[in-house]
Design a protein with these regions (language model features):
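Hydrophobic alpha-helical segments, chiefly the membrane-spanning helices
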Residues: 166-168
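Structural preference for beta-rich elements and adjacent junctions enriched in aromatics
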Residues: 3-160, 164
Length: 168
């Protein structure tokens, strides 16, 4: 992302916060239905945010496991994003087409640019994305999530007779 080094909006904040600074995003409509999608955003300081979109509504409570790395240099900043197939759901088909979008927000100007033009006045933002073709022979991974927990129960009865002798 070519930018004046001194004007890059970047500060460290918590995950899923701080999207009021320079960021890059990639979005996938994995079922190519124009309604449901996944969006991954990364700021210049490598703060991640991810969300699911459904009918133009955001679910920011969703958290996927993915990686990103950013680098700020004399020309601006660059980003590398790794999103494993296990982070998203997609159909079990030998040949797939997904919706795809890239975007960039520049804080100092309030500018938001997208790879595929989007008319914000028109509903169905995801339906306006480009098409990613050529995804072949990718099987949806097995998903299993385990949450460990412990449960206990304690039952005590008091005897009215208190003795100091041990009984067997």
């Amino acid at each position: 992302c070519s930018s004046d080094l001194k004007k890059i909006g970047n500060s460290l904040v918590l995950r899923d916060e701080g999207m009021d600074q320079d960021y890059f995003l990639v979005g996938f409509d994995t079922y190519h239905d124009g309604v449901n999608a996944y969006r991954f955003r990364v700021t210049a300081s490598n703060v991640q945010a991810d969300e699911r979109l459904k009918s133009d509504n955001l679910d920011q409570t969703w958290d996927a496991v993915w990686n990103s790395k950013t680098k700020i240099d004399d020309d601006g900043w660059s980003i590398e994003i790794e999103i494993p197939f296990s982070a998203i759901r997609f159909p079990n088909k030998p040949l797939q087409e997904w919706g795809l979008q890239f975007g960039r927000y520049i804080k100092r100007s309030g500018e938001f640019d997208t790879w595929s033009p989007v008319n914000p006045q028109k509903s169905g933002v995801v339906a306006q994305w480009c098409i990613l073709k050529g995804i072949e022979n990718v099987d949806p991974p097995f998903r299993l999530s385990l949450t460990p927990y412990i449960a206990g129960y304690y039952n005590s009865t008091r005897s009215e007779e208190h003795t100091s002798e041990l009984q067997s």
